[in-house]
Regions:
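Hydrophobic alpha-helical and helix-loop surface patches within well-folded domains
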Residues: 1-128, 181
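Beta-strand-rich binding/interaction modules
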Residues: 95-96, 106-184
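Amphipathic alpha-helical scaffolding segments comprising HEAT/armadillo-like alpha-solenoid repeats
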Residues: 96, 195-206, 227-234
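Extracellular/luminal regions of secreted and cell-surface proteins that mediate adhesion/ECM remodeling
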Residues: 113-115, 191, 203-204, 216
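Short acidic/polar inter-strand loop motif in beta-rich domains
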Residues: 185-195
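Structural detector for internal amphipathic alpha-helices that build alpha-solenoid repeat scaffolds
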Residues: 189-191, 213-227, 235
């Protein structure tokens, strides 16, 4: 839980700077002064992307790549591509698209999300719209895996993974009617989202959720409603 709270704080610091001051790629050669690089993009923003990279390749391969990078380039001038190649050597993956999207491009995913449940078909329908696209700022669509967590009426927790590749995407997941649903229960992805699957489900998540991400999502969305019952649940 402590790590997840830290990740939430780091995401907030980075997103706050990107929304309220400026947005830039993590890796860039455009700056007025080198000190300008030591900002919320570089540290919390960069840390979050390394966290996602570790999730992608796995702990053992990630740290083996880091060790090769340190041992090979200690006391030498390096480029970000050197680090990328070390991780690729141990993961066996081509990471060009990941680094291009998350390190060499601007912004982060901003999702407008909704949920409906079809009792007859036993399907949960999730709609995701990426709203961060801004051609003037050079912010484009992202491709990302996103975990969806849900709890059934018996109290059992489930996690499904969806892959977002389009501006607007509908995903159907076979499930029993959930007591609550949430996005990214294990704090694996960097994004900002609006997601209210229903006030009753949010209150259930607030009371019975088991993750930091779930608690934060429930509190945030309930507060947005301004309803007395929901505000009382938060207190």
């Amino acid at each position: 839980d402590a790590m997840h709270w830290q990740l939430a704080e780091e995401a907030s610091s980075y997103i706050g700077e990107a929304k309220n001051r400026y947005v830039r790629p993590i890796i860039t050669r455009e700056y007025d002064h080198s000190w300008n690089m030591f900002d919320m993009h570089l540290y919390p923003g960069g840390a979050w992307r390394l966290h996602m990279l570790r999730q992608l390749v796995g702990d053992d391969k990630f740290w083996a790549g880091v060790q090769e990078y340190v041992n090979t380039y200690a006391a030498r001038t390096v480029k970000s591509l050197d680090f990328q190649r070390c991780i690729e050597n141990h993961s066996g993956l081509n990471l060009d698209s990941f680094f291009d999207m998350w390190f060499r491009s601007k912004g982060y995913p901003i999702l407008k999300s909704s949920f409906e449940y079809d009792k007859k078909k036993g399907l949960g329908k999730f709609t995701f719209e990426q709203t961060q696209v801004d051609t003037e700022k050079g912010i484009e669509l992202f491709e990302m895996g996103l975990e969806i967590g849900w709890q059934d009426a018996r109290g059992a927790d489930h996690v499904d993974t969806v892959h977002l590749t389009k501006g607007t995407q509908i995903v159907n997941i076979k499930m029993d009617e959930p007591a609550h649903v949430m996005l990214d229960p294990n704090m694996k992805s960097l994004f900002e989202a609006e997601f209210n699957p229903g006030d009753d489900k949010l209150r259930h998540l607030l009371e019975h959720g088991k993750t930091v991400r779930g608690l934060m999502q429930a509190m945030s969305e309930l507060a947005k409603t301004g309803k007395r019952k929901n505000l009382k649940a938060i207190r």
